[in-house]
């Protein structure tokens, strides 16, 4: 067998094992939460001695990072598909489609949503170089949709400047995302994001109670439309 073929087979085998580790990690999240992640248990499920799994995942923190990247990527891919599949007649329809896709993913994947937007895992610090880009893809989708509203004139720009250091922070955000909104619009974007994540978390984590809402999805749509209306307020 040629050297290139052997290297390719080893790489494929490694990728398959790494994918299986992530899959088993997802199951652990569902069954035990982030605090219950165990590389030893994953090794047992793979039929490996516990020391062998460390050839693929160096630590529990590394497993958490892999699961974070996996969840952020899956969420963002879901949003991208929803935008592709939705015939949006306006920027506001696009914003609502994004929000619905985020909620749909969260309701389907409550344990993974908890990993992304629940309580931080004690002692774990996500490496920004591996998580920041993928973690902001959904935010970038919102910015893209809202930028279209600015382009149509539905969302008007003003001369309002936020106090420091807020204004400087907003300028960094504009540069990072290529976003044309002024400080007032960026503030409204933060309100939108906080409202969407907060409403979803209240539902997913059971904070509304079992009998309060007959159809949480309808309530979420109403909340999202109110947030969109704020964006267009003059």
UniProtKB/Swiss-Prot annotation:
The keyword DNA-binding applies. GO terms for cellular component: cytoplasm. Its main location: cytoplasm. Induction: Positively regulated by alternative sigma factor SigD. InterPro entries: Homeodomain-like_sf (IPR009057), HTH-type_TetR-like_transc_reg (IPR050109), HTH_TetR (IPR001647), MT1864/Rv1816-like_C (IPR025996), Tet_transcr_reg_TetR-rel_C_sf (IPR036271). Pfam families: TetR_C_33 (PF13305), TetR_N (PF00440). Residues 15-75 form the HTH tetR-type domain. DNA-binding activity may be regulated by fatty acids. Gene3D superfamilies: Tetracycline Repressor, domain 2. One of its GO terms (biological process) is regulation of DNA-templated transcription. One of its GO terms (molecular function) is DNA-binding transcription factor activity. It comes from the Bacteria. It is found in: Cytoplasm. The keyword Cytoplasm applies. SUPFAM superfamilies: Homeodomain-like, Tetracyclin repressor-like, C-terminal domain. Keywords: Cytoplasm, DNA-binding, Transcription, Transcription regulation. Residues 38-57 bind DNA. May participate in the regulatory network that controls the expression of MmpL lipid transporters. Binds to intragenic and/or promoter regions of rv1816, mmpL3, rv0204, mmpL11, mmpL7, kasA and mmpS3. Homodimer. Contains an N-terminal DNA-binding domain and a C-terminal ligand-binding regulatory domain. The C-terminal regulatory domain can bind saturated fatty acids. This is HTH-type transcriptional regulator Rv1816.
